[in-house]
A protein has these predicted regions:
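Intrinsic, low-complexity polybasic segments
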Residues: 6-7
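PEST-like low-complexity, intrinsically disordered acidic/proline/serine-rich tracts
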Residues: 24-273
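Bacterial N-terminal signal peptides
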Residues: 11-24
């Protein structure tokens, strides 16, 4: 698939350039601190196949440090069932093809903007899920960002202020943590290839903890202005023991517009690296 390759190569060339320029984004910098209270095998390793933990009231917990498989970040359709296709509205398919032809040069994340929902579920960086009464918070290492999911019984607002992460409310349905989100701005990208979404977008995520070390997220994308019907993808999260998220300051090392000057907005630094 040409669009996947070109978007991927653009990202990889950018990463390589940042490394050569002294960008300090390295897995070797991650902290090494034993995670207390988790099941372990006889050799001391985290037992990722142990039963899923539960809170005192018997509900599963999704708290912990996780990373996605990242198989959907370049191409969200990898999470669809075989034979399914994205049900584009004609204008949205045309916009997507334009972004493919431009090698996704207008990707908001290239300007250190957060990926939004559900794209941030796919990025190849860790994120920490924290559960507190009335609120689940997700701390993303990528772009040093966070997301709030309100679990105090409130409804989604009727006229929210448009935002990259939207507005999210959550509830438990059996063993699934169900998150509904709306209130997005009109420049959301669903993946690195540039599949679009807009202010009519509504995302439903169902988090199911399979065992101690794995969570499956079933994601429904419903945007009637952009797609002709709702459609679904699935991603898997992997538990990361004995470490933590680290600081990620995108703007300190952002040289994207010097590498790809024709994507730069007015006033951005371009030219020599």
């Amino acid at each position: 698939m040409k669009y996947v390759a070109s978007a991927f190569m653009r990202k990889m060339l950018l990463v390589a350039a940042l490394v050569l320029l002294g960008a300090e984004i390295s897995a070797g910098q991650w902290l090494k601190v034993p995670t207390p209270g988790i099941p372990r095998t006889p050799d001391g390793r985290a037992d990722l196949n142990a039963p899923a933990p539960r809170t005192a009231d018997g509900k599963p917990t999704i708290a912990g440090l996780w990373r996605p498989t990242a198989r959907l970040i370049e191409n969200i359709t990898r999470g669809m069932k075989p034979g399914e296709t994205v049900p584009f509205q004609p204008w949205a398919e045309a916009l997507f093809k334009t972004r493919v032809a431009n090698n996704a040069k207008d990707d908001p994340t290239s300007n250190c903007i957060v990926g939004g929902v559900p794209r941030s579920d796919f990025v190849p960086y860790p994120f920490k899920i924290i559960e507190t009464p009335g609120l689940v918070t997700i701390l993303y290492e990528a772009v040093h960002s966070f997301r709030q999911i309100f679990t105090d019984g409130r409804k989604l607002p009727q006229d929210p202020n448009p935002a990259w992460f939207g507005y999210s409310v959550g509830r438990w349905e059996g063993d699934a943590f169900v998150v509904e989100s709306s209130g997005f701005n009109d420049n959301v990208w669903l993946d690195n290839a540039g599949r679009p979404a807009g202010e009519a977008l509504r995302v439903t995520e169902r988090f199911r903890r399979i065992d101690f070390g794995h969570i499956d997220i079933d994601i429904t994308i419903d945007d009637p202005k952009t797609y002709t019907r709702p459609w679904n993808v699935t991603e898997r999260l992997l538990y990361i023991p004995d470490t933590d998220i680290i600081e990620y300051m995108c703007t300190e090392n952002n040289r994207y517009f010097r590498i790809v000057p024709d994507a730069a907005p007015p006033g951005a630094p371009v030219g020599k690296r």
